[in-house]
């Protein structure tokens, strides 16, 4: 294989000698001792003695040349013999062992022991050790060898890669020379240049020579190889052939005087390299860069990493030699140089074209061919690296030989036919294994990529497609996208906090009928729901195809809660910033295995409302506000709110329709419904009852602006003229003015700095009689609106008032006591019943029969109840305010509460509505109609003059004792409306001038109320 090591030497060493340093350069070294004593090769003895002192004896630094070094002698067969030397202190003498075995560490250790014996004149121990070593059979590589108590070592293996720090030569070479110089030296050796290395220490010098040449494995330097050059052989530096020579720095002055042309010179002491060639640049760039990176990574680690980095470079350059092997029947295996060069890439061909002319490569190929043709075969780390790397290519012929060829007496035993089948099997298995590993790696990478992007594996669950509506679908005005529920994984129950109401779509599914926040039901994925083979209908598909695949049902139709409301409807999915969950971003599919029943309510507005644009409107429609608010739980059906009682939704429609009893029951039993109309309220039925109760709907409050009243009065007159068509309609003027009015309230109430401002107290004499009373009356709560609510036109929730103020003058006084911003900051936690202090100066202090416990967010708005006897649950229209259930009081069994008409007396709902409207149209805007089946609380016109001023927010009023409401709970006459506050107003008819101290005292009580 081109190795210059002698195989199977006769003894472990040839000769051991001790040499004394000569007194001058003209004298020869004096031989002191020799073992074995019968060694007769005088020529070798003369040469060895001259190599024992390879430096200038006249140099002042000759005593500091180091201790251990190795020289090499070449025999007649071009085999190397290593001379392991150890210089004594001051370099006065040298101990040398000449051997064919490259056991550097073992012989250095033995030399130290022998030097100690000589210094102590222990000749018997020295001779015994040398005799044992010389007569010991050569052990196998890797086996321990015991010579004496103090001399034992492990036999090194020349076929293994050298490691750091076990290999002394590689360790010193790697420490002394930097990476770039190592690469340049490696490239120069591949191009077989004339290389000179100099150093002031003999140990480092010879280590660099041996270490650099070892990096050529599995190739060997085939030219002049002199690790350390003695003074009498300096003329070798002018040799025309390639060489690798080490010279002590004391001899460099003589070498520089010679004509050295095309010599690569490396000075280890200064770590500088001089070369007239571009050998490193001529190597393939990918090989050099990979080698450099590997060496730098291994610079701080131990082991064979550095040697393996060079081995990989050798494999990448020469590993494809297998493809150039030619196997002919009954002929020796040969190597085709043209095939070796032509099958590689164009960037590598120039180097390979030069490599086939190199002596080291030719010796390498000849050694491989000798082993192949002899039938012995081979297996070393280089071949293993080729098999592991990507350098082998299609080495079919080589595998064919490895599996089948056997040669004896110079002839093949088997024919090529018998060798072909097992060879092909080997190649097939090799390729199959590599293919499987490659496919598995690709799958794993794709799986990891999908899991990193989507959060789940595609092998177990298919991701829900996100389909954006196309332009074709937007043009289909009659097609309706089906309302589907969110299918996905079960989410943990959320904390019981106040939430906004659900949308107005009541969706019921058999698969999710029992879901609740505390016990969520596992939603089936679309992949499971489509197990029957039905594919989900994409919104992009044709409507005819969608109709065929849709389950036939008379109750289920394509329902759209968002279309057919306004012309400026936004049907695009909510923005990413509005989504609180990944489920909001998915486009749900239809489940064809289960049929869903959709029950919906919608607002049918007039044609004017369809075409107009509501001011200060963020969303195109109130429903869009609901669908994009962010709580993804609202999209899950049958998920009950913890803060909202069960109530039936009653919305006005264009035609006067009597509520159907069955449909009302169905809606109540199936799902929670939230009121979305403006101006009506429905009393929830008590648990266990099957018929919904009729509610009492007080009219909305009146604005207090003169300019606003003019437009509102005109609008109301227009509606009064046609009371039959009024049901379910909202006048454009009132809606615009109300939205503007509410916009002003939002602006006024949004500033939090007003909380710290001093409260304005009016102390004018001649104040209206009803001012202070309206402040203290819990029924004068006025309109409720938080800073977070949208304008009137875009309210997604019901906007109702339990009662309304009779005059705008009362409102102006009420807002003087408490600032608008301060009213938003009051939130009342549930508290037990307590006695109220008499806030009304004209009424006696009464014990509170039942105080309404208010629950809401800290920034919520307090709302007073209409009455304590309206039902088993008292609730308020704004979400987040919940009144605890209270038993029916005796007032229900009294005198026809709120003028309730007996069941036996029929009453035309249209007449009743028009009657109520005629009485109250002059001082209040009617936002929505009062549907049939509900009773209205009529209001008397104010006898006071209207006061100019901006509408203000009402101060929060705590629950009042129920007895204060009794004057209003009087029977009403069918022909004339009765003011429920008439008695109380008559009682307080006298003019009251509040004192400044009294008002200040009341204001402090309101501010400190908990």
From Swiss-Prot:
Subcellular location: Cytoplasmic vesicle, Clathrin-coated vesicle membrane; Presynaptic cell membrane
UniProt domain dDENN: residue ranges: 298-375
Keyword tRNA processing in record: no
Domain cDENN: 160-296
Amino acid composition bias (Basic and acidic residues), ranges on this chain: 472-482, 538-548
Signal peptide span: none
Domain (uDENN) ranges: 13-143
A GO molecular-function annotation: phosphatidylinositol-3-phosphate binding
Domain of life: Eukaryota
Motif Clathrin box, residue range(s) on this chain: 560-569
FXDXF motif, short sequence motif: residues: 378-382
Stretches with biased composition (Basic residues): 493-502
GO cellular component: cell projection; clathrin-coated vesicle; clathrin-coated vesicle membrane; cytosol; presynaptic membrane
Key words of the record: Cell membrane, Cell projection, Cytoplasmic vesicle, Guanine-nucleotide releasing factor, Lipid-binding, Membrane, Protein transport, Synapse, Transport
Protein name as annotated: DENN domain-containing protein 1A
């Amino acid at each position: 294989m081109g190795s210059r090591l002698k195989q199977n030497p006769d003894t472990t060493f040839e000769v051991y000698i001790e040499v004394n340093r000569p007194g001058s350069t003209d004298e020869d070294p004096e031989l002191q001792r020799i073992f074995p004593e019968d060694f007769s090769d005088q020529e070798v003895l003369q040469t060895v003695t001259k190599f024992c002192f390879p430096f200038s004896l006249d140099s002042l630094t000759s005593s500091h040349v180091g201790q251990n070094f190795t020289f090499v002698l070449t025999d007649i067969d071009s085999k190397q013999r290593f001379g392991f030397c150890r210089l004594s202190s001051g370099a006065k003498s040298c101990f040398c062992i000449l051997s064919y075995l490259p056991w550097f560490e073992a012989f250095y250790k033995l030399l130290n022991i022998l030097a100690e014996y000589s210094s102590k004149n222990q000749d018997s121990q020295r001779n015994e050790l040398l005799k044992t070593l010389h007569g010991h059979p050569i052990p196998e590589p890797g086996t321990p060898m015991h010579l004496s108590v103090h001399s034992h070592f492990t036999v090194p293996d020349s076929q293994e890669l050298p490691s750091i720090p076990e290999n002394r030569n590689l360790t010193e070479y790697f420490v002394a020379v930097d990476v770039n110089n190592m690469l340049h030296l490696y490239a120069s050796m591949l191009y077989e240049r004339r290389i000179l290395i100099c150093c002031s220490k003999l140990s480092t010098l010879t280590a660099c020579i041996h270490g650099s040449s070892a990096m050529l494995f599995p190739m060997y330097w085939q030219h002049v190889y002199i690790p350390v050059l003695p003074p009498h052989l300096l003329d070798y530096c002018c040799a025309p052939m390639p060489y690798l020579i080490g010279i002590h720095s004391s001899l460099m002055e003589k070498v520089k005087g010679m004509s050295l042309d095309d010599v690569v010179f490396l000075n280890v002491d200064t770590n500088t390299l001089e070369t007239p060639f571009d050998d490193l640049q001529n190597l393939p760039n990918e090989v050099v860069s990979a080698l450099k990176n590997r060496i730098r990574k291994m610079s701080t680690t131990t082991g064979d990493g550095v040697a393996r980095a060079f081995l990989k470079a050798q494999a990448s350059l020469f590993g494809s030699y297998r493809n150039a092997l030619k196997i002919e029947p009954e002929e020796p295996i040969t190597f085709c140089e043209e095939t070796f060069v032509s099958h590689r890439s164009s960037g590598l061909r120039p180097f390979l074209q030069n490599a086939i002319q190199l002596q080291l490569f030719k010796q390498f190929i000849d050694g491989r061919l000798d082993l192949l043709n002899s039938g012995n075969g081979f297996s070393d780390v280089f071949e293993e690296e080729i098999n592991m790397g990507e350098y082998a290519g299609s080495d079919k012929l080589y595998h064919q030989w490895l599996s089948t060829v056997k040669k004896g007496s110079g002839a093949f035993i088997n024919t090529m036919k018998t060798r072909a089948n097992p060879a092909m099997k080997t190649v097939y298995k090799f390729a199959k294994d590599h293919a499987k590993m490659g496919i598995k790696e690709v799958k794993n990478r794709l799986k990891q990529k999908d899991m990193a992007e989507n959060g789940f594996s595609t092998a177990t669950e298919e991701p829900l497609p996100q389909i954006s509506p196309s332009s074709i679908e937007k043009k289909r005005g009659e097609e309706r996208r089906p309302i589907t529920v969110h299918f996905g994984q079960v989410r943990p129950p959320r904390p019981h906090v106040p939430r906004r109401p659900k949308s107005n779509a009541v969706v019921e599914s058999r698969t999710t009928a029992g879901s609740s926040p505390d016990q969520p039901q596992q939603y089936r994925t679309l992949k499971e729901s489509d197990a029957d083979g039905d594919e989900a209908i994409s919104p992009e598909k044709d409507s005819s195809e969608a109709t065929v695949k849709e389950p036939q049902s008379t109750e289920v139709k394509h329902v759209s809660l968002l279309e057919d409301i306004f012309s400026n409807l936004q049907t695009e999915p909510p923005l990413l910033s509005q989504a609180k969950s990944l489920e909001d971003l998915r486009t749900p599919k239809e489940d064809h295995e289960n049929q869903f029943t959709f029950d919906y309510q919608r607002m049918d507005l007039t044609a004017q409302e369809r075409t107009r644009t509501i001011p200060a409107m963020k969303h195109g429609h109130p429903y869009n506000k609901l669908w994009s608010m962010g709580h993804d739980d609202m999209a899950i059906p049958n998920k009950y709110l913890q803060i909202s009682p069960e109530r039936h939704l009653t919305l006005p429609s264009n035609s006067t329709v009597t509520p159907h009893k069955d449909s009302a029951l169905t809606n109540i039993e199936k799902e929670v419904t939230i009121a979305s109309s403006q101006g009506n309220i429905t009393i929830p039925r008590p648990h266990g009852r099957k018929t919904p109760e009729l509610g009492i709907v007080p009219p909305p409050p009146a604005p207090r602006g003169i300019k606003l009243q003019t437009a509102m009065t005109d609008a109301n007159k227009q509606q009064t003229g046609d009371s039959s068509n009024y049901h379910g309609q909202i006048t454009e003027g009132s809606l615009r003015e109300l939205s503007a009015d509410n916009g002003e309230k939002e602006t006024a109430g949004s500033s939090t700095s007003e909380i710290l401002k001093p409260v304005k107290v009016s102390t004018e004499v001649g104040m209206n009689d009803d001012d202070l009373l309206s402040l203290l009356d819990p029924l004068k709560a006025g309109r409720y609106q938080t800073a977070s609510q949208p304008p009137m036109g875009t309210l997604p929730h019901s906007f109702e008032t339990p009662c309304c103020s009779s005059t705008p003058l009362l409102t102006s006084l009420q807002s003087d006591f408490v600032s608008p911003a301060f009213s938003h900051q009051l939130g009342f936690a549930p508290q037990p019943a307590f006695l109220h202090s008499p806030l009304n100066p004209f009424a006696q202090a009464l014990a509170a029969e039942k105080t309404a416990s208010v629950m809401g967010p800290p920034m919520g708005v307090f709302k007073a109840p209409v009455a304590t006897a309206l039902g088993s649950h008292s609730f308020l229209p704004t979400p987040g305010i919940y009144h605890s259930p209270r038993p029916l009081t005796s007032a229900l069994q009294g005198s026809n509460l709120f003028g309730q008409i007996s069941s036996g007396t029929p009453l035309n709902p249209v007449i009743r509505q028009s009657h109520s409207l005629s009485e109250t149209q002059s001082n209040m805007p009617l936002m929505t109609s009062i549907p049939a089946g509900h009773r209205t609380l009529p209001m008397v016109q104010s006898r006071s003059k209207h006061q100019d001023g901006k509408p203000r927010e009402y101060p929060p009023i705590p629950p009042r004792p129920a007895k204060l409401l009794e004057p209003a709970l009087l029977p009403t006459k069918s022909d004339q409306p009765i003011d429920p506050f008439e008695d109380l107003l008559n009682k307080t008819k006298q003019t009251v001038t509040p004192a400044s101290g009294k008002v200040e005292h009341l204001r402090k009580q309101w501010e400190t109320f908990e």
